[in-house]
């Protein structure tokens, strides 16, 4: 039950914005079965999975709702029992009917994975009604994306605002994106800045990055530099790449090839295709570092593997 939020960003030159926000998925919920709580990030022996499956099954039959949620995950993943997605859904449905907010939320996630957006929306709505903030966020995402319901930015914005006020920073971030640059939504840079800042102040790296991008759009390079630096420190690859470009192109700072090289290097190691391409260029020409054509080719290959077609073409003609 290792669940994470995925926010997809689209890079256009130096600007990146979130498009089609993704469903928020919780970590494995609480466990009240003393000495028998599983860590889904670990790998256990088959015998241990079978033992735990038996415990969760017995506890679920005794109306331990938290155990039922774990049992559903065991059926879904085939841990200690034959994989049975239908049984997993059945257990989550019954547990959700008992007003367990975690079950309702996980039920929504399963329906979403099955591309049944309508049923996902209903499950998330119930989780939200039971005061599970991640479910509320997911309802907003579905309205934002038009999943299971007609796209409605106004409703999405209302819910994002509510969860943001409860310091759920993905909500602040997605609301900022709506105000920043979403087709069909009136731009409000002042509000976008405020919301990006709130999420960034809590180390939500992509929010720091987008705020930096917004400042860069307005040619406020000093502010952009500080925010790219923070996001890069939080290991956000494109922020490292953009920070390098400011030093490379002398935007708001003195040109500094060594600093640019350092940040392109970090960007590439964090899997920024653009960072790898620039790093290769620096090695090829000996900019900010010792010339090394062999390394230049290696980083171009990585940029190609990361999907940068331009890098693939250069590798083919490399000499």
What residue ranges belong to the model's regions?
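N-terminal segments that cap or nucleate solenoid repeat domains
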Residues: 20-74
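Hydrophobic face of amphipathic alpha-helices that form TPR/SEL1-like repeat modules
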Residues: 37-45, 55, 70-77, 91, ...
